[in-house]
Amino acid sequence: MSDLRISEAFLYMDYLCFRALCCKGPPPARPEYDLVCIGLTGSGKTSLLSKLCSESPDSVVSTTGFSIKAVPFQNAILNVKELGGADNIRKYWSRYYQGSQGVIFVLDSASSEDDLETARNELHSALQHPQLCTLPFLILANHQDKPAARSVQEVKKYFELEPLARGKRWILQPCSLDDMEALKDSFSQLINLLEDHEAVRM
């Protein structure tokens, strides 16, 4: 091979290296989804979202009105609007539903029968609300680390999810602050539902 061809070969290799290092461009932006997070006071909404955002437990304060958190994942960013769950706040939930692309409903699986019935009624209302009924739902049975916690099967039966949510996109998962892997897996499943839902809409 002549010196000219060798020089051309080296120049071409230098060009390829330059393209790889300098012309790659920024990575594609992660998709963002706007979600609403609802559930009774004490269900653990704020604590779960703060944990996912790697915030200090000492900074967690129960939400009285609403708050918004950007929860980052490897393949998406979830902009979660968390609504307070007190009696005097729940009647205003529907005012904040517009623009949501998905729903997170958190329930206390170790709560009293009265609170569990209230949570069931609120979930039924959300599943049938005109602005939410077609959206993906992630239902989290929280506080699974407590002795009185009900299993996912018990929650599914009590909440009558099979007949009520038939034909809808929903996931029911157990969770607790002690099991972050399970919590992140639940949100990964939700992101898959969100991607599928947006693909169908497009």
Swiss-Prot record:
The UniProt record lists the keyword GTP-binding: yes
Family: Belongs to the small GTPase superfamily. Arf family.
Organism: Bos taurus (Bovine)
One MF annotation (Gene Ontology) recorded for this entry: GTPase activity
Gene3D superfamilies: P-loop containing nucleotide triphosphate hydrolases (3.40.50.300)
UniProt keyword annotation of Ligase present: no
Keywords recorded for this protein, A-Z: GTP-binding, Nucleotide-binding
Residues binding GTP, per UniProt: 39-46, 82-86, 142-145
Name of the featured protein: ADP-ribosylation factor-like protein 15
SMART domains membership: ARF, SAR
Pfam families: Arf
InterPro entries registered for this protein in UniProt: ARL15 (IPR042292), P-loop_NTPase (IPR027417), Small_GTPase_ARF/SAR (IPR006689)
